[in-house]
Structure formats: C-alpha cells, structure tokens
C-alpha cells in the first residue's frame, strides 16, 4: 500500500506536467460552434463561386494588382480539398500561412489576420469543415506575372512583414470592446480590405481601417474609422443595422464585395457580437480617408 501511495505521489505531478505540454491541436473541435466561426471568418464569400458554385469548393477568382488568385477548395475532398489535412495542418495554415508540405501561402488568404484567432476557434472551424459534403473540384493555379509567381518569395515577405502575434485582450477595456476587437482584427479580417496597402501588398499599420483605394477586384473600400470620410456620424445602432441588413443610415444599400460579406457573414452573427463590433469601431481614433 505504501509503495502504491509513493507511486501515485510520483505519477500525479508527472501526468500533470505531461498534460501541460500536449500540443494544443490535440484539443477537440466543436463542429456546431465551428459553423459560427465560419460565419465570423467570412469563408463562404471567398471559397464559394457566386450564384452557382458548390459550397466551399473554391475556384473564385480574386483579381489584384499582383495577378489573379483562385480560392482553394476547403471541403473534405481528399484529392482536391483538405480532406487529408489533420488538425495540426489546419492550425498551421491559419497561424503560420503554411501548407501541410511547408509551402508558403500568399496573403490573399488572410492568415495575416487569422493568426490572431484562438486555437479553439481554429479547431472548431476545422471540425465543422470536416462535416460539409466533399466536392471534387480542381481549382486553377494562380495566374501571377513574374516575379509574383515565385511562391518561395513569400518566405522573405513573411519574415519582413508578417506579425503572427495572437490577440490579447486589453484589461482596460470592456468585454464587449475586446470581443469586437477580436472579431474585427482576427476572424473578421476587416483590415485586409479596409486598410490601405503599399506596393508590396503590406497593410499600412499607421492607417488601420482608413479605407483602401484599390480593394478586391479594384473597387474602393471605405474608411470605417470615425475620421473624415469615415463613419464618424454613424451611431453604434447604425453600424449594427448595416452589418445585419446591409442598409446605411441614409437608406442606401450595401454594394460591391461588402454585399457578400453581409449576406454570408455579418448578417449571421449574434446581436451581441454585432454590438461588440460597433463598440470597437466607434472607439477607434479618427483617421483621414486613405482612398
């Protein structure tokens, strides 16, 4: 009996230590919650071809100054989708912008924002994607002129410009503000379109969310700070209504790429999350329109 007690006394702290170093991706994802993460992250708008595309089967063309990118198939198809990815592969893609074979993704895949997501959100999303119908849909290769087609160049780009720091709540702000900051800067990846970029495709960290003259498909994307040309005259309720039903305070309807964002993402968020986004956006320092 004494020997057993001594053994247990030794094993309990040992097991605790081992459990503390188990890889986080060993956690399990919640598919039901993952569907909500899918909506927060706006996956459908990019990974489903408009009107007649198979759900999440990719193939949507994104036209940019660097060439045309085609969004990948993220259904569980093992040949043309992500059916042979494990949880670690998926987390690495979102957190590091790397494929299962170690290749570097272009930042048209907004891992530059997704890296701020919690690992649990990533795993929940993967769990949901594992439940959708597998679709065999080979996607065209990106059509990029030299030198942008050299994928290995992304190693240097990421080394210089990629900040993979996870989101950290601000203890001086409310829970609603922190939730809004997390959604806007993490899964919602709002800055990927609403922040201006330089000639190397790097977002201007000095002018976050100040608008972008050359957004998706060459369209201008508005300033969503309270600054001149922005949404300074919008109330929090105005922001919530816009994200929920796509109508501006002056009764205009949403247009351009934001139409898909509202239909496939923000309109499906909870009232509390929409209010959290509004709380965060109305608190931002005003920045002059960058368009």
Please state what every model-predicted region is.
Residues 61-92, 112-122, 208-249, 262-274:
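Electron-transfer interface patches adjacent to heme c in soluble/periplasmic c-type cytochromes
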Residues 21-39, 156-185, 228:
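Electrostatic cytochrome c docking/interface patches
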Residues 137-152:
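Extended, well-folded interaction surfaces typified by the phenylalanyl-tRNA synthetase beta subunit core
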Residues 244, 256-291:
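A cross-kingdom marker for long, charged
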Residues 1-7:
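N-terminal secretory signal peptides that target proteins for export/translocation
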Residues 34, 40-50, 90, 125, ...:
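The canonical Cys-X-X-Cys-His
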Residues 88, 97, 102-106, 110-113, ...:
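Membrane-embedded segments
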Residues 9-20:
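Bacterial N-terminal signal peptides
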């Amino acid at each position: 009996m004494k020997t057993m007690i001594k053994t247990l006394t030794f094993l309990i702290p040992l097991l605790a230590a081992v459990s503390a170093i188990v890889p986080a991706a060993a956690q399990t994802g919640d598919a039901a919650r993952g569907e909500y993460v899918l909506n927060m992250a706006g996956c459908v708008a990019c990974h489903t071809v408009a009107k007649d595309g198979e759900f999440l089967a990719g193939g949507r063309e994104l036209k940019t100054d660097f060439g045309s990118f085609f969004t990948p198939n993220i259904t569980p198809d093992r040949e043309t989708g992500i059916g042979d990815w494990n949880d670690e592969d998926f987390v690495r893609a979102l957190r590091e912008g790397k494929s299962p074979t170690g290749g570097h993704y272009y930042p048209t895949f907004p891992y530059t924002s997704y890296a701020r997501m919690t690992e649990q959100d990533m795993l929940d999303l993967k769990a949901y994607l594992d439940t959708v119908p597998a679709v065999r849909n080979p996607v065209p290769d990106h059509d990029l002129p030299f030198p942008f087609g050299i994928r290995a160049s992304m190693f240097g780009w990421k080394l210089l410009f990629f900040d993979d720091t996870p989101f950290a709540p601000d203890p001086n702000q409310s829970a609603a503000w922190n939730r809004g900051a997390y959604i806007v800067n993490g899964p919602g990846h709002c800055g990927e379109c609403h922040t201006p970029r330089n000639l190397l495709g790097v977002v201007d960290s000095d002018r976050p969310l100040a608008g972008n003259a050359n957004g998706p498909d060459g369209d201008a994307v508005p300033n969503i700070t309270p600054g001149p040309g922005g949404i300074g005259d919008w109330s929090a309720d105005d922001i919530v209504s816009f994200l929920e039903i796509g109508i501006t305070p002056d009764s205009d309807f949403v247009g351009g790429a934001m139409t898909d964002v509202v239909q496939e993402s923000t309109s499906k968020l909870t009232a509390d999350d929409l209010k959290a986004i509004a709380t965060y956006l109305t608190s931002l320092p005003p920045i002059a329109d960058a368009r």
